[in-house]
């Protein structure tokens, strides 16, 4: 598309979203929930159509995508049913605008009210996973925001049909279809345009690879919530229950290897490595996991491919794990500090002292003791769905549910008071 034409088109989308945000911010919680129930109903009614288009799109891109990535793009009837159920579950959650509201009397006599409000216009730029289209639309509407969606080229046809269904639902209920909008241009230019649409967008949330998110953070003039990559580590302390550790590591790696809360790196205390690693590698190899490691790990088991320097900072999103030996807790903490993406870091140990030090010193959005990294998830935390997992410290951190899509304002109620 002509650059000038694209600029005008995306500015128009931004302008419409800003106007729509004023509409949705005035809707009651009952009205917002009614929209979500309509979404659920229409998605289920149109499931055959969605699956047909999704299957066709997957065939077009199959040769260019890894198997885990294909799974992320797939929308089966079962997945659609799960999405519809999650929308109905979201309806049951409390109104985020009703939370955190407080008031007090100021010394000068007037009343101050701290009131929770929506952010306004939320823009989502994401790669792959078309279920993000529904999650983002539902969470933003529940929290009384408008949303602009820009998905990847691999799922553009699926996203088009999903957004069309959502917009039809809005129109049937008498609301503006501009509450949910999709940017259909999947070129790099459309991303650049969005990054500079500060006049209309209140916050931008990118989801995708580490390099993609870094590009957005480095180049956006719109405020960004960084949903960083997950180069997640598990440290197996020498006191760990080895059978339990194997169970947790296998779950963390293989349950869904293409997501950001999948374990990518394993640190093992050298004192237990010779006993522990062959048993673990048996399980991982049986599950099709490629094992990489340093020379010390190779000497223990010849199934290990020698890791390169880049491995220690790579989020694989695949059935690959890299293993490194450490001599003590301090070495593990220092290693993680050097290679972390501040997403999820875990320790497996029976030492309360070591667990406490690890939990205290590790700088990550989620730090886990004796549990799978896969629990870093808004649904698992009880937030309902999530719009992303923030790895920054401002404005939100960790799994972002409804309250992460709100801010607050102060209202003053006076009786003619003046400042002296």
Swiss-Prot record:
Keyword Amino-acid biosynthesis listed: yes
Keyword terms, alphabetized: Amino-acid biosynthesis, Cytoplasm, NADP, Oxidoreductase, Proline biosynthesis
Q: What is its main location?
A: cytoplasm
Top-level EC class, please? oxidoreductase
Under Gene Ontology molecular function, one entry of this record is: NADP binding
Mind telling me which Gene3D superfamilies this protein's record contains? Aldehyde Dehydrogenase, Chain A, domain 1, Aldehyde Dehydrogenase, Chain A, domain 2
Subcellular localization, as worded in the UniProt entry: Cytoplasm
Cross-referenced Pfam families? Aldedh (PF00171)
Point out the signal peptide segment.
none
- Disulfide topology: none
Provide the E.C. number(s) assigned to this enzyme. 1.2.1.41
* Statement: the UniProt record of this protein carries the keyword Oxidoreductase: yes
The GO annotation for biological process reads:
L-proline biosynthetic process
Q: In which pathway does it act?
A: Amino-acid biosynthesis; L-proline biosynthesis; L-glutamate 5-semialdehyde from L-glutamate: step 2/2
Provide the reaction this enzyme catalyses: L-glutamate 5-semialdehyde + phosphate + NADP(+) = L-glutamyl 5-phosphate + NADPH + H(+)
Task: Check the record and name the NCBIfam families matching this protein.
Answer: PRK00197.1, proA
Which HAMAP family does this one have?
ProA (MF_00412)
Family membership noted in the UniProt record: Belongs to the gamma-glutamyl phosphate reductase family.
This molecule's function is given as: Catalyzes the NADPH-dependent reduction of L-glutamate 5-phosphate into L-glutamate 5-semialdehyde and phosphate. The product spontaneously undergoes cyclization to form 1-pyrroline-5-carboxylate.
Q: What is this protein called?
A: Gamma-glutamyl phosphate reductase
């Amino acid at each position: 598309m002509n650059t000038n034409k694209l600029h005008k088109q995306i500015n128009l989308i931004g302008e419409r979203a800003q106007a729509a945000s004023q509409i949705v911010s005035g809707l009651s919680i009952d009205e917002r929930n009614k929209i979500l129930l309509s979404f659920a109903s229409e998605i289920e009614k149109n499931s055959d159509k969605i699956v047909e288009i999704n299957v066709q799109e997957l065939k077009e891109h199959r040769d260019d995508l890894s198997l885990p990535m294909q799974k992320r793009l797939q929308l089966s009837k079962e997945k659609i049913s799960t999405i519809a159920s999650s929308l109905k579950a979201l309806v049951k959650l409390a109104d985020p605008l009703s939370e955190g509201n407080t008031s007090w009397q100021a010394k000068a006599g007037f009343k101050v009210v701290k009131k929770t409000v929506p952010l306004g216009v939320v823009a989502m730029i994401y790669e792959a996973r078309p279920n993000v289209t529904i999650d983002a639309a539902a969470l933003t509407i529940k929290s009384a925001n408008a949303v602009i969606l820009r998905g990847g080229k691999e799922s553009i046809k699926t996203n088009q049909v999903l957004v069309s269904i959502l917009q039809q639902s809005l129109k049937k209920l008498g609301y503006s279809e501009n509450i949910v909008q999709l940017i259909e241009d999947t070129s790099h230019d459309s991303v650049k345009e969005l990054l500079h649409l500060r006049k209309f967008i209140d916050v931008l949330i990118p989801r995708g690879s580490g390099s993609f998110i870094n590009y957005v953070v480095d180049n956006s003039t719109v405020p960004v919530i960084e949903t960083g990559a997950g180069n997640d580590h598990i440290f197996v302390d020498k006191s760990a229950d080895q059978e339990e550790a194997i169970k947790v590591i296998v779950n963390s790696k293989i349950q869904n290897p293409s997501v950001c809360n999948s374990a990518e790196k394993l640190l093992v205390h050298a004192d237990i490595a010779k006993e522990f690693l062959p048993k673990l590698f048996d399980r991982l190899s049986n599950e099709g996991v490629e094992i990489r490691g340093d020379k010390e790990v190779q000497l223990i088991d010849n199934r290990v491919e020698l890791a390169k320097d880049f491995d220690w900072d790579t989020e694989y999103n695949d059935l690959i794990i890299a293993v490194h030996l450490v001599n003590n807790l301090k070495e593990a903490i220092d290693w993680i500090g050097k290679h972390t993406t501040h997403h999820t870091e875990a320790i497996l140990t029976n030492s309360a002292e070591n667990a406490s030090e690890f939990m205290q010193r590790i700088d990550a959005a989620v730090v886990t003791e004796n549990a799978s990294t896969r629990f870093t998830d808004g649904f698992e935390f009880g937030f309902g769905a999530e719009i992303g997992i923030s790895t920054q410290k401002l404005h939100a951190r960790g799994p972002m549910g409804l309250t992460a899509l709100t801010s607050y304002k102060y209202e003053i109620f006076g009786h003619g008071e003046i400042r002296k």
